Amino acid sequence: MRLPVAARVYVGAVIVLGAAIVAGLLPSLQFPHPSLFAGLLALSVISSALKVDLPVGVGSSCISLSYAVDFTALLLLGPAPTVLIATASAWSQCSFRMKQRNPAYKTIFSMACLAVTVAATARVYTVLGGTYGQLASLQALMGAAMAYFLVNSAAVAAAFALANRRPVFEVWHDNFLWSITSYVVGAVAAGIVVEVWQRIGQWEASLALLPLCLTYRTYCIYLKRIADEQRRVAEWTQLHRESTEVLAR
């Protein structure tokens, strides 16, 4: 499907902005904890493939556990390494377990969206007093989580809205607002990981992923029920249409 001009301009602008952010962060890229970076990178790529399709009415979208991993990386490593981790997770999410192959521009757009999201989240986190490598105040943690949710969901919703010529806020409100709980849970889990990492060690910190696994499983069940309900409604609608046509003859 050929995108409307407004959608193409928007997608192109986000890609350019994302590329500029990555290029701007590369000079400050450091790996003081290479094993931690490698572990979070692998975990983010793997968890991004464990995605749940969202029943949006304007296209296809999904959520995954990679958000919490990326958020944890931001708290522990800072924005530069996290941008690499987040863009890799976006690539994985758009490349694996797909019902149909994504066009290249969608994959690049998703990667750019996460680069922009990480940069904005990092800015909010530091403005609220957060520091990397140690757990900050609840205000900084929740503020950063809300920034991540708002920037990421709004960026994706805008793309869907422009592609389908619908109001951006309507698309965001109807299809993305409800997922805010997953971001709150992810931020709390990331905070627990950082705290346990500092006090005990990295292997014990992995226990904080249990709430995320439960959240993921809950979403799977919930969205499966929505999909089943939508299928039943479609079947009844089709049956009603066929019955009406028969009676009209």
Model-derived segments and spans:
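Short helix-perturbing small/polar motifs within transmembrane alpha-helices
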Residues: 1-174, 178-203, 209-217
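Acidic/His-rich, divalent-metal-binding segments that scaffold phosphate/diphosphate chemistry
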Residues: 206-249
